[in-house]
A protein has these predicted regions:
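Walker A/P-loop nucleotide-binding motif
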Residues: 100-116
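Loop/turn-to-beta-strand initiation segments
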Residues: 101, 128-130, 161-164, 192-198
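Post-Walker A helix-loop "phosphate-sensing" segment adjacent to the P-loop in P-loop NTPases
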Residues: 121-134
Length: 258
């Protein structure tokens, strides 16, 4: 068997990184002094690393982050906001995901909720958790269109199945009765087997009223599906009169969401 034949077979098996590394070994005289087992181990390591990197890129691309540049290390703790650094660092380990616990990030417009949520989402991707970002208004539109088109189950699964789901602009607008049913169904499917990150301008205590309060038979049921054992980050200002939008701090276009 010729070396070219070996490389062709590696490429046919989609072991492209290994094929490229094998070609490099053949062209480098120094590798002749390295035992076969070590050479083969290097080839396997290169292919393995390539596949892991490609998988990570796929996860990040499919997540659809609003702010894909978000980085947990770049969260600004000196911008006049009250932030629990210890809690944020603990959440960055993604232990809450293996525990199937939720995360509530609340605060005023421009305080950095979306950036923080995307940063947590990026950490989830780095640990190879299937992650999805979506604005709640967009999700509800998707489900309404899918109901009309006969694809409701498929679209619902698209949002129910990810290990981590980031729901931005959570309850920014009060949902209709039909939308409440969709929200309940989604959160019921995700309960105790996945983690959801909720980003909202409203503090948790206000969510019940945003869901219709006593007039809605589903308000209690929805809150019950998400409230237990949740982590909560409420981003508040130290000096509201001198606040600087986190869009400016992170160098984002001011027309973007937080």
């Amino acid at each position: 068997m010729t070396n070219q034949s070996t490389m062709d077979k590696l490429i046919e098996m989609r072991l492209t990184a290994m094929a490229d590394a094998f070609r490099s070994q053949l062209n480098d005289p120094k590798f002749k002094e390295i035992p076969f087992e070590d050479q083969f181990g290097m080839l396997v390591d290169i292919e393995y690393s390539s596949r892991k990197n490609n998988r990570l890129k796929r996860l990040i691309r499919n997540a659809g982050f609003d702010q894909p540049e978000a980085n947990i290390m770049d969260i600004n703790y000196a911008s006049g906001r009250k932030l629990n650094k210890e809690l944020i660092r603990r959440l960055a380990t993604c232990e809450y995901i293996s525990e199937h616990r939720n995360l509530f990030i609340t605060g005023a417009t421009g305080c950095g909720k979306t950036y923080m949520a995307c940063a947590f989402g990026m950490e989830a991707c780095k640990q190879y958790y299937n992650t999805k970002y979506i604005r709640l208004p967009d999700l509800l539109i998707d489900l309404e269109v899918a109901r009309t088109d006969g694809n409701y189950k498929k679209v619902m699964a698209k949002y129910a199945n990810p290990v981590v789901l980031i729901l931005d602009e959570w309850l920014l607008l009060k949902p209709t009765e039909s939308e409440q049913r969709d929200i309940f169904e989604l959160l019921h499917r995700r309960r105790k087997k996945s983690s959801t990150i909720f980003c909202s301008q409203y503090e948790f205590e206000e969510w019940y009223d945003q869901l219709g309060g006593d007039d809605s038979p589903l308000a209690d049921a929805i809150i019950d599906r998400i409230a237990h054992d949740s982590y909560r980050i409420n981003i508040t200002s130290i000096d509201a009169e001198h606040d600087i939008s986190m869009r400016e701090v992170y160098g984002l276009d001011k027309t973007l969401r937080e």
